[in-house]
Every structure is written in C-alpha cells, then in structure tokens.
Curated annotation (Swiss-Prot):
GO terms for cellular component: cytosolic large ribosomal subunit. This protein binds to the 23S rRNA, and is important in its secondary structure. It is located near the subunit interface in the base of the L7/L12 stalk, and near the tRNA binding site of the peptidyltransferase center. Gene3D superfamilies: Ribosomal protein L6, alpha-beta domain. SUPFAM superfamilies: Ribosomal protein L6. It comes from Clavibacter michiganensis subsp. michiganensis (strain NCPPB 382). The gene is rplF. This is Large ribosomal subunit protein uL6. Part of the 50S ribosomal subunit. Belongs to the universal ribosomal protein uL6 family. GO terms for biological process: cytoplasmic translation. Pfam families: Ribosomal_L6. One of its GO terms (molecular function) is structural constituent of ribosome.
C-alpha cells in the first residue's frame, strides 16, 4: 500500500469537498478548484476526511494512488491558505514594476518585457528587485514563476538574472589573466 496514498486527508472547517465520480471539487475561503482523478483511483469523503483508494496492486494503480492523494491535499491547502513563490531580480539596472494586469521587467534587453498574470494568479512587487507570485493552484503558481525565471536565467559568472527567493546560483571562476 502506498505510504502517502493511504493517509487520510483532513478537511478543515470552512472547506467543502465534493466527489462526483472521477471529479473532485474543493471549495474554500480563497476560491474553488476542481480535479479529475485517473480512472482506477477512487476518492470518497467520510467523517470530515477524504480517503483515496485503489482497486488493485498493479503498477499504474500504485503510482497514481499517492499522486491523487497529494493533488487533492494541495487543492485543500490552496483554497485555505494559498501558495506563493518568491522571485529576486539580480543585476545592475534590472528591475520589476507592476503594470496593468501584469508585471514589466527591465532585464538588459533592448526592450521591456511584459508578463500578464494568468487567471487565478496575482503578482506583488516589493521594491524594484523582489516580486511574489500568488495564487491558489500550486501547479499554476510554480509554472508562472518558472516562465518568468526563464526570461533571464541567472548566469553562472556574475549571477545576474531572475532567480527564486533563496536559490543558490552555482558560480564559475572567470578566465584567469596572464
């Protein structure tokens, strides 16, 4: 039995979990998320807990069991507290500012780069070189932060670029002069 999959998920007060066949809908104070679970896996709500079960011990069922339980648990955390991902902009002249429904970056290109916030995502900017991606969907928050980081990844010589908050950039030594 999957060690993660067999653990029941506690449903906190103020959160409503509805299971309709293979569709799980989670409603909470921050919003609503829905999830379609894979075919052999079943989910049910009992006594304020969500139980995820699998019908057999086939390889596919075992792999989907823990995944499904984690996805449902992530949705419950998302609608109660939400998710954040911090980004730091490092480099001379590199900056970020909120503009319309997104953010605008100056990252050393000949033009500013504008990133619009996807539905369900908001940006907060602290100063000119720190920002946070905020949302209730863990996967969408991480994907949006990764897409922003991809615009200008931290380079290994000076460390300039967009990095995650707390990320260590492996630095290389430059050319040694004569």
């Amino acid at each position: 039995m999957s060690r993660i999959g067999r653990l029941p998920i506690d449903v906190p007060a103020g959160v409503d979990v509805a299971v309709d066949g293979q569709h799980v809908t989670v409603k909470g104070p921050k919003g609503e998320l829905s999830l379609t679970i894979a075919q052999p896996i079943r989910a049910e709500v009992q006594d304020g807990q969500v139980l995820v079960t699998r019908p057999d011990d086939e390889r596919e069922s075992r792999s989907l069991h823990g995944l499904t339980r984690s996805l449902i648990a992530n949705n419950i955390v998302g609608v109660t507290t939400g998710y954040t991902k911090g980004l730091e902009i490092v480099g001379t002249g590199y900056r970020v500012a909120i503009k319309d429904k997104g953010v605008e970056f100056a990252l050393g290109f000949s033009h500013p780069v504008y990133v619009e916030a996807p539905a369900g995502i908001s940006f907060t900017v602290e100063g000119v070189n720190k920002m946070t991606v905020v949302g209730i969907d863990k996967q969408l928050v991480g994907e949006t932060a990764a897409n922003i980081r991809k615009i200008r990844k931290p380079e290994p010589y000076k460390g300039k670029g967009v990095r995650y908050a707390g990320e260590n950039v492996r630095r290389k030594a430059g050319k040694s002069g004569k």
